[in-house]
């Protein structure tokens, strides 16, 4: 009985040793796992701190530093306002781009006709293209005579003697289209011509000053006395002096500049929309004025 009990005790001890031997590596493995978890946590915190450093970055040069403004002799309210500068955090807003780059669709099209004007001469001499020769498409060439007139008009060099090309047509009766084209081009040249500028050698009033309304006394006088007409018995020079005196145009020894100002004033009155409307109203009023004159009521209309 004693031997059997001792054998049973030994077997139990062996079983306990096996259990402990099986449990010891598991404990070691768990300890290693704990160490690995600690390392992972530390690496994650390091990476987070690195990301924060990258986001915030180093302080920019010239940025706001609260230490620079601590010594200012200001009240507590102003110092409180300075604290709002450091508290403010700007918001990142993604702006939508209105213009986006894109590649346009390929659209085949017929190009311009190549007139071969860029081809150099075979002898190698310069052709002065663009200086002496105008680079134009071959489909619509300009008339050299009209072009020289345009250049002369734009440069305002009318007194320079130069060789001008004179265009002539053979059998003009059979080519009316060329004549119409010439008339149209010359008419366009005259339409685009700016008005002539005249510089007076003596002081002359402005056109706007001469177009001002007359005084009521003078208008009343004109209602009683009519203006002198060309049938008056006087010379042409005296008649010019009278008309210029009525219109407040000064007259000097040479009456050419006074006459130019007189005709310029007449042209301004003729082209004025205001006086055109007055003239049309006067024409429309003529029948009624006749009826009133027949009734015996006289009315005088003055336009200034």
Swiss-Prot record:
One Pfam assignment: IFT46_B_C
Region described as Disordered: spans on this chain: 1-67, 285-304
Localization (cell): Cytoplasm, Cytoskeleton, Cilium basal body; Cell projection, Cilium
Gene Ontology CC terms: centrosome; ciliary tip; cilium; cytoplasm; intraciliary transport particle B; microtubule organizing center; motile cilium
Keyword annotations of the record: Cell projection, Cilium, Cytoplasm, Cytoskeleton, Phosphoprotein
Annotated function: Forms part of a complex involved in intraflagellar transport (IFT), the bi-directional movement of particles required for the assembly, maintenance and functioning of primary cilia. May play a role in chondrocyte maturation and skeletogenesis.
Assembly with partners or alone: Component of the IFT complex B, at least composed of IFT20, IFT22, IFT25, IFT27, IFT46, IFT52, TRAF3IP1/IFT54, IFT57, IFT74, IFT80, IFT81, and IFT88. Interacts with IFT57, IFT88 and DAW1. Interacts with IFT56. Interacts with ARL13B. Interacts with TTC25. Interacts with IFT70B.
Family: Belongs to the IFT46 family.
Name by which UniProt lists this protein: Intraflagellar transport protein 46 homolog
């Amino acid at each position: 009985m004693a031997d059997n009990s001792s054998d049973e005790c030994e077997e139990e001890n062996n079983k306990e040793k096996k259990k402990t031997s099986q449990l010891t590596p598991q404990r070691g493995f768990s300890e290693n796992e704990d160490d690995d978890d600690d390392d992972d946590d530390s690496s994650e915190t390091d990476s987070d701190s690195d990301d924060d450093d990258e986001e915030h970055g180093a302080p920019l040069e010239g940025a706001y530093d609260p230490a620079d403004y601590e010594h200012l002799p200001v009240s507590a309210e102003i110092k409180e306002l300075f604290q709002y500068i450091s508290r403010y955090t700007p918001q990142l807003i993604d702006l939508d781009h209105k213009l986006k780059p894109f590649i346009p669709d390929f659209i085949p099209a017929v190009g311009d006709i190549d007139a071969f004007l860029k081809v150099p001469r075979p002898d190698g001499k310069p052709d002065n293209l663009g200086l002496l020769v105008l680079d134009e498409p071959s489909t619509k060439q300009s008339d050299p005579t009209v072009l020289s007139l345009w250049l002369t008009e734009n440069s305002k060099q009318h007194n320079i003697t130069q060789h001008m090309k004179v265009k002539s047509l053979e059998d003009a009766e059979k080519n009316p289209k060329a004549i119409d084209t010439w008339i149209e081009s010359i008419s366009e040249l005259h339409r685009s011509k700016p008005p002539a500028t005249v510089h007076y050698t003596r002081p002359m009033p402005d056109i706007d000053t001469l177009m001002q309304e007359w005084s009521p006394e003078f208008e009343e006088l004109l209602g009683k006395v009519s203006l002198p007409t060309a049938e008056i018995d006087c010379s042409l020079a005296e008649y010019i002096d009278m008309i210029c005196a009525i219109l407040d145009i000064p007259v000097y020894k040479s009456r050419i500049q006074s006459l130019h100002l007189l005709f310029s004033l007449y042209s301004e009155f003729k082209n004025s929309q205001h006086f055109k409307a007055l003239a049309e109203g006067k024409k429309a009023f003529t029948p009624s004025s006749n009826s009133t004159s027949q009734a015996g009521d006289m009315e005088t209309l003055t336009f200034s």
